[in-house]
């Protein structure tokens, strides 16, 4: 496993259908897409990254409302975070405001020249949103 200073940070965009996942580089400067998974697949990939690279922290997007208030999804995210903590005891798991991450991800994908069909491929938006969540976290802690 890597030394403590080079452990990775995972970013997660939780959705009811898919879970977008991003991974920091070893220096924790950039978010890289890892893919989209269901819960079972997520546990497998987190276990693999933990064993191969080490995980310092898992950052889960927390969807606050425009007014900064909790909403219907925040309760779902709270339960998801509790499940992650149970599955990965000893791993730090934090939430990070993901306000409008999916909307921003869609705009970035559109601006990148991706066709509408490409932008709407399963998981592409979820992974892009996970990257935005993780990059926001990395930028705010640099």
From Swiss-Prot:
EC number, as in UniProt:
3.1.-.-
Q: Where in the cell is it found?
A: Cytoplasm
Recorded hits in Gene3D superfamilies, A to Z, give: YqgF/RNase H-like domain (3.30.420.140)
Asked if the keyword Hydrolase belongs to this entry, the reply reads: yes
Q: Name one GO molecular function term.
A: nuclease activity
The broad enzyme category this protein falls into is hydrolase
Q: Where is the signal peptide?
A: none
This protein's record includes keyword Hydrolase? yes
Report the sequence similarity comment from the record. Belongs to the YqgF nuclease family.
Q: Which NCBIfam families match?
A: RNAse_H_YqgF
Protein name, per record: Putative pre-16S rRNA nuclease
Record the organism: Chlorobaculum tepidum (strain ATCC 49652 / DSM 12025 / NBRC 103806 / TLS) (Chlorobium tepidum)
